[in-house]
Amino acid sequence: MPIHEVKHPLIRHKLGLMRRADISTKNFRELAQEVGALLTYEATKDFNLQEKTIEGWAGPVSVEQIHGKKVTIVPILRAGLGMLDGVLSLIPVARVSVVGQIRNEDTLEAETYLEKLVGELDQRMALIIDPMLATGGSMISTIDLLKKAGSTEIRALVLVAAPEGVEKVLEKHPDVSIYTASVDERLNEKGYILPGLGDAGDKIFGTKQKDV
């Protein structure tokens, strides 16, 4: 199933806190990291394990370790940085690629202004992270870049998604799996998610939030 709406009680509770209009930058930032980590847990539960014998405190012991999986985390700037530490807390050896996307507020189309990708993308699973999947433009553009650079296995972690954006992404890239805390109701006329979280980038970085 390409869309996974993760309804774990901890995720639902934390997402509810994030929806508050009066939430502080500190609390929003911390919750974005926490929910990002919980989504990572769900998105990686099919990783293969291999048994290995190590030296334990009382002698040799058989353990299981993740085998054969290289990962690159791909935050979409700038808001995706707000989830990065949470994902890295669970996959600390992952390489980080960076894609900068900005939305043209007149056309609602995504424009790429930065692309810094790690090597060997054909040998890595790419985890795209972005708090909001709204119109889908930034996500589609980022997936296009990754595939052009050699990526063959791509998953996306988003805190909140709009059904319109999900539909567009999966129409263009049906092989990409999306993990989200919530598929919300719809987009408003300005392309923002309702009920959504407001402008996640502004809330993470403490900048002035636009009228959404």
Swiss-Prot record:
Catalytic activities: UMP + diphosphate = 5-phospho-alpha-D-ribose 1-diphosphate + uracil
Glycosyltransferase as UniProt keyword: yes
Activation and inhibition: Allosterically activated by GTP.
Tree of life domain: Bacteria
Gene Ontology MF, one: uracil phosphoribosyltransferase activity
EC number: 2.4.2.9
Key words of the record: Allosteric enzyme, Glycosyltransferase, GTP-binding, Magnesium, Nucleotide-binding, Transferase
Keyword tRNA-binding included in the entry's annotation: no
Cofactor note: Binds 1 Mg(2+) ion per subunit. The magnesium is bound as Mg-PRPP.
GO biological process: UMP salvage; uracil salvage
Swiss-Prot/TrEMBL cofactor(s): Mg(2+)
Alphabetical list of SUPFAM superfamilies matching this protein: PRTase-like (SSF53271)
Pfam family, one: UPRTase
Gene3D superfamilies: 3.40.50.2020
Binding site for uracil: 193, 198-200
Positions annotated to bind 5-phospho-alpha-D-ribose 1-diphosphate: 78, 103, 130-138, 199
Family stated for the protein in its record: Belongs to the UPRTase family.
HAMAP family named in the record: Upp_B
The protein's name in its UniProt record: Uracil phosphoribosyltransferase
Source organism of the structure: Marinobacter nauticus (strain ATCC 700491 / DSM 11845 / VT8) (Marinobacter aquaeolei)
